[in-house]
Amino acid sequence: MRKLLLFIFLLPLLFSQRGLSQPVDSIDFYMLTCEPGNEVYSVYGHSAIRVVVRGTGRDIVYNWGLFDFDTPHFAFRFAKGKLDYMVGACSMKTFMEEYRVEKRSVWSQKINLTNGEKINLINRLDENMRQENIYYRYDFFYDNCATRVRDIIENSLTGSVSYPVEENEKTFRELIDQCQQRIPWLDFGADFLLGLPADKKATVRDEGFLPMLLMKNLGSATVNHSGKREPVMSSPSLILDMRDVAEKKPDVWILPLILYSLLVLVVLITFVFGIPILGKVSDWILFSLLIILSSQLEI
């Protein structure tokens, strides 16, 4: 996270329309999709935008998945999906190394943009990277690292975007259940914390809150360019294949069940019954339990 934050105030200078000396047609944009990881906060995957300025060595990744561990009630806000997240950026080399270490595969899709749309996207990235805009209120279904990528791409396009039609729409709960089939405690925890809003039907566009589905659905979407419908982006290309080297963890359920019971107990005591547990200490208890739980399971 420290490496990512180093670039927060540098990127507007690197890629703003004013500071860009290269012709816009020498800039390429890509959507990156990272497979789910072995931690609670990475189990659903990740999305980012890559910007390459050919002939300059500039190769930067914009990432809306950063958060501050010092946020009050961090663990509860995180689990509930109501945490303040932030945008940052790093070099493509740094970004890829992180996923290589975590043994998580990465896919890339080139975004199909006119020169005018490229300028739109540059300006939107520049706007996002301003100090007053780097924080946003995370929402699990409607405003996360994947939906931010989707929205900034859609809003940069000058034509209308059409998604493929899906006859049997799933609920948000059914979609996340698919991600948690081998993690019963997390499945139960999500049901406990997300409540009734998770039972709403999700459109194909809505499904983009999950990075792997965003890769599929936005990759199948089309945009109207001068009366002609064209793909929004290319088919996914696997640029980091870690599927055969990912570590597998044994199925150990007793400890997770005990720890999850403690997690529920802390949440009930602190937030339902209103009994404070040493203030910020309860945050660290919650987050520690989440991390320990995730480390016990095969994701």
Where are the model-predicted features located?
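Bacterial Sec-dependent N-terminal signal peptides
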Residues: 1-22
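Generic ordered-secondary-structure signal
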Residues: 13, 18, 139, 197, ...
